[in-house]
Amino acid sequence: MRFMRVAVFGLCMIPAAGVAAAQDAPSVEAQQRTLRTVTAFAQEYLDRIPNFTCTRTTRHMVAPAATQKWHDQAVAAYELSYYAHDEHYRLLTVDGALVKRVPAKSMAEGWLELNGNFGWILKELFAPGVHPHFAWDGWQRVEGKRAMVFSYRISLEESHAKQAVCAGRFFFHSCKEKNYGFHGLLFIDAESMDILRVSDTPDNLPSNYAQGISTVDYGRVKVAGEEYLLPIADRIQTYNGKVLFRNDSTYTAYRKFSAESILKTDAP
């Protein structure tokens, strides 16, 4: 099984559910102001994000659904180049060995592959045209930082998100796409207003498509002396029948792909 996401996206607050979520909550006006600030930043980010190349290192794991005892399939390193508002992958190594494709023995129990995390979720949440429903969800800490947490939901009718099941051994080829709605959580640094983490869970998908949760962590990364807000890690966990799959990835060795526009992530 292989899994990809392709995308192209207002702002709507709904009341938070439950007493716990309302405790110590900022005023509705403060929540709306925070979301407006983040939306404005994200829309500029998507319009002006420079082209980059980095290394994505993914630990592929699998487990029987009955026991949930995880074991490693492989550790794969990919060159990820981001340009023309799209991701381009090249497999570098599997378990440290130079290869052009994932060995069949590593894929014997199935194989989960994901693209789209570099800019996908921010585009879905914040680009004009879709109106996610936000609700206050509480406070949490992300890597020691106090984060404002909002739940969100995008309906199938409004969503442009797509997921694909791909048949061939080559990544992201021979794929059948399906449109879906989704929901998740948005974590915002209470001081800097940086986006720290976004999670998403698909809705409305047939059983043969990936059913699970994906989380992307963002951090400030210096590239050529400039600072950018970029993905630093992600996790996806899903299942296919009686088998669970999990990918834990890190993004390192960022460098400029080409000279383009510059987006600094100074706090508003």
Residue ranges and their predicted role:
Residues A22-H183, A190-L196, T201-S214, G219-P268:
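Structured extracytoplasmic
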